[in-house]
């Protein structure tokens, strides 16, 4: 059953913790998060770590308000080739996942594939992949390494100043 070979029960976790309070009467907030998701296709995974800091002090009898924010994220993703779903539905169910023989190990990592005559003249490549036939969906998942790592850091600083001599006059910088 090719579907049993490529699919799995997906399990995910998502954890967050935050803390807020005052340091010397000045408010702050900090948070951390972690996400781990395993996709329904066996090799698909996603992991993410997040963090944020916020600090909002006031100075000069609350005439100068500051709001500083910093947010960061790191994510790692392994993508599964979506074509394996169609291949699993239509691949010959009588064929094995793995093939016996040194030629299959050399050419296809030990996985069964529909082959054709090698017309390239390269003796180190004993079998040729038949590109008119479907690929073994398990070999597609295991031999492809579609990965990505993402990182981002965003910061913001906001200043709001009310003049002492004219409180309705303000300067706001963001």
Model-derived features: where do they sit?
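Outer-membrane beta-barrel transmembrane strands
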Residues: 8-24, 33-34, 135-174
């Amino acid at each position: 059953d090719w579907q049993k070979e490529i699919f799995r029960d997906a399990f995910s976790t998502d954890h967050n913790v935050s803390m807020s309070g005052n340091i010397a009467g000045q408010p702050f907030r900090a948070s951390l998060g972690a996400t781990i998701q395993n996709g329904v296709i066996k090799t698909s995974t996603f992991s993410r770590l997040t963090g944020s800091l916020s600090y909002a002090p006031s100075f000069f009898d609350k005439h100068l308000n500051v709001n500083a924010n910093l947010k960061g994220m790191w994510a790692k993703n392994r993508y599964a080739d979506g074509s394996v779903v169609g291949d699993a539905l239509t691949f010959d169910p009588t064929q094995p996942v793995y093939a016996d023989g040194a030629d299959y190990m050399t050419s296809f990592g030990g996985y069964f594939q529909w082959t054709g005559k090698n017309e390239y003249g390269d003796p180190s490549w004993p079998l040729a992949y038949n590109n008119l036939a479907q690929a073994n969906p398990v070999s597609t998942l295991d031999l492809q390494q579609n990965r990505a790592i993402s990182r981002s850091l965003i910061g913001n600083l906001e200043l709001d100043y009310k003049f002492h001599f004219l409180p309705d006059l303000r300067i706001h910088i963001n």
